[in-house]
Every structure is written in structure tokens, then in C-alpha cells.
């Protein structure tokens, strides 16, 4: 599942399915909406010609990732998973959405106080840790240990990481 940066959509899609961007979400809100637009569209066309120039602003949310953008991304992916389950198509997107959740929750693994939250977010993501292209081997090992009740290994890895970086 790729990401559509821009597009032209029929107004009737928004009206017929009561689609709108989620309020209060400033990161991944376009992905939240485009998934639904593509799902409900009877036809999707890809035009290989630029119609506008995408400008990245230095002050944009893409350049200022923080705890709120992390939470937004996690919420968006959880809501898309819920949507796919409601539509009865989650099995078709399970692997891709689990990969996205692993990427979105990787920061949680680096702080012991967040381990429970990591484990609770989409429990079936543990089946896709090793083949997820978005995270490095050390994080994969840490995630695998956490999801398989081997948190003592994760704690050891976390302490070694802190020691290596001069933080105690």
C-alpha cells in the first residue's frame, strides 16, 4: 500500500460515505482519508504527469516530528485497522498495517515505561517483526523479546545501549 500525496476526488465520495479528515490529527491525516477514498472508489486512475509542484515548508510537521506526531501516526494506523476489520478486509492488509504499526511504535521500545503500550498496540504485529523493512535488526530483536515475554533481554539490551551512549 503506497501513499498518495495528492489527488482529485469526486465530492460524492466524501458525501456518500461521510468522509472527512480526523479532527485534531496533524500527521498522517491524509493517509487516514486516502485509504477510505480508495476503498470506496469504484475506479482509481493513476496519471503519470505532474499537475502541481509539491513544496516542503521548513516549519511543516514533516520536519518537526515529536510525541504528538508519533501518537497521531499510531492512532491513524489503529483506526485504519479498525476500518479494515469493519469492512471485512483486514486479512488482505494485515501484513502491511502491522509493518506500519511496527514502524510507528519503534520509539516505544526504547523506553521501559512504554513497553506495555507497545505490546497492546495491535497484538498480531509480532508475527511480522522479522520481515518488516522499516526497522533495524536491534529493534527487531528487542521487539521480538518484548512480544514473546522475554523483557529481561530487552532490558539488558536497553541498558547496554544506554551504557554505550554514556547515559546511565
Where does each model-flagged region fall?
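Short acidic alpha-helical/loop segments enriched in Asp/Glu that coordinate divalent cations
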Residues: 56, 93-96
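Amphipathic alpha-helical repeat scaffolds of TPR domains
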Residues: 96-107
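Inter-helical turn/loop segments and adjacent helix faces that build the functional surface
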Residues: 23, 87-92
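Membrane-interface aromatic/basic loop that binds lipid-linked glycans or pyrophosphate carriers
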Residues: 111-168
Amino acid at each position: 500500500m503506497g501513499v498518495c500525496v495528492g489527488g482529485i476526488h469526486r465530492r460524492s465520495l466524501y458525501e456518500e460515505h461521510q468522509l472527512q479528515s480526523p479532527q485534531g490529527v496533524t500527521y498522517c491525516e491524509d493517509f487516514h482519508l486516502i485509504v477510505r477514498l480508495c476503498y470506496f472508489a469504484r475506479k482509481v486512475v493513476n496519471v503519470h504527469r505532474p499537475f502541481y509542484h509539491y513544496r516542503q515548508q521548513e516549519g511543516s510537521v514533516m520536519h518537526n516530528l515529536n510525541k504528538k506526531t508519533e501518537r497521531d501516526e499510531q492512532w491513524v494506523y489503529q483506526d485504519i485497522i479498525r476500518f479494515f476489520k469493519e469492512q471485512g478486509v483486514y486479512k488482505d492488509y494485515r501484513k502491511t498495517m502491522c509493518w506500519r504499526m511496527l514502524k510507528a511504535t519503534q520509539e516505544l521500545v526504547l523506553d521501559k515505561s512504554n513497553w506495555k503500550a507497545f505490546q497492546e498496540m495491535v497484538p498480531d504485529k509480532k508475527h511480522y517483526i522479522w520481515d518488516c523493512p522499516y526497522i533495524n535488526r536491534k529493534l527487531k530483536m528487542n521487539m521480538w523479546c518484548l512480544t514473546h515475554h522475554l523483557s529481561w533481554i530487552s532490558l539488558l539490551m536497553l541498558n547496554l545501549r544506554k551504557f554505550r551512549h554514556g547515559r546511565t
